[in-house]
């Protein structure tokens, strides 16, 4: 066993040296001790249209008996594109069991991006990702930045020996309709980042949800041993909506839960009201299913106290 781990480590070192030689500064070492790396891949070295960041952790079992743990990050990567690319990477692993595959993964991603650049789609940096834009959304993904949530989630995955995980039950909330736009929340309990992928895949099996204009999501998983959270969010083209929803979940201290809000755009711009509807959908389903702790009640009580204080002051003034 020890010999195998040593062989794996040496194989990883050789592979990383080769990748550094091939890709130069594009290949970034995030944490050498934890074997965490990332690379930004694009469709062109001159004026890239499509860009994606591949982040990986190399477990002790790689390459002999385990694939790299990975995450694909890009503002435009969603739905069918994400599933297609993930399936391509999995296929490469299955066809090359026991071998180093990172170079093949990087080049498969580049091939995928080149394919998209050759279509009629102008690309994410040349078009608005939403029919309503209030906040600038940067198309560049800084390869050197790896947030703590990703590191926590990947390390959590390394230590998780629960085996095959089941798809958690998914609950669908009531719809909110405003000027022909419809919003609906979906909620599921989660205890690992892998379950997040299972839930998304399951939701996308529903044609109505899969064809929604946006599927915004956020999740929070509490890691008791570390007294910390694995948390992440996705705007899915509705700029800053995912961050707003995650912030709401933090205020509510929602734990071990994922919320997806689908929006079907009806052709009439809603402006800031769309964020209100997205968060209301999320809040309603979280409160209905008891995922809110004292945080919400505390904020309500504070607001109530302020209101009472103002009323008392008015009476005193009179």
From Swiss-Prot:
InterPro entries: Impact, Impact_N, Impact_N_sf, Ribosomal_Su5_D2-typ_SF, RWD_dom, UBQ-conjugating_enzyme/RWD. GO terms for molecular function: protein sequestering activity. CDD domains: RWD_IMPACT (cd23821). Residues 14-116 form the RWD domain. Coiled coil: none annotated. Its main location: cytoplasm. The keyword Cytoplasm applies. Residues 296-318 are annotated as: Disordered. Keywords: Cytoplasm, Differentiation, Neurogenesis, Repressor, Stress response, Translation regulation. GO terms for cellular component: cytoplasm. The keyword Cytoplasm applies. It is found in: Cytoplasm. GO terms for biological process: cellular response to amino acid starvation; GCN2-mediated signaling; intracellular signal transduction; negative regulation of transcription by RNA polymerase II; neuron projection extension; positive regulation of neuron differentiation; regulation of cytoplasmic translational initiation in response to stress. Residues 308-318 have a biased composition (Basic and acidic residues). Translational regulator that ensures constant high levels of translation upon a variety of stress conditions, such as amino acid starvation, UV-C irradiation, proteasome inhibitor treatment and glucose deprivation. Plays a role as a negative regulator of the EIF2AK4/GCN2 kinase activity; impairs GCN1-mediated EIF2AK4/GCN2 activation, and hence EIF2AK4/GCN2-mediated eIF-2-alpha phosphorylation and subsequent down-regulation of protein synthesis. Plays a role in differentiation of neuronal cells by stimulating neurite outgrowth. Interacts with GCN1; prevents the interaction of GCN1 with EIF2AK4/GCN2 and inhibits EIF2AK4/GCN2 kinase activity. Interaction with RPL39; this interaction occurs in a GCN1-independent manner. Associates with ribosomes; this interaction occurs in a GCN1-independent manner. Associates with actin; this interaction occurs in a GCN1-independent manner. Belongs to the IMPACT family. This is Protein IMPACT-A. It comes from Xenopus tropicalis.
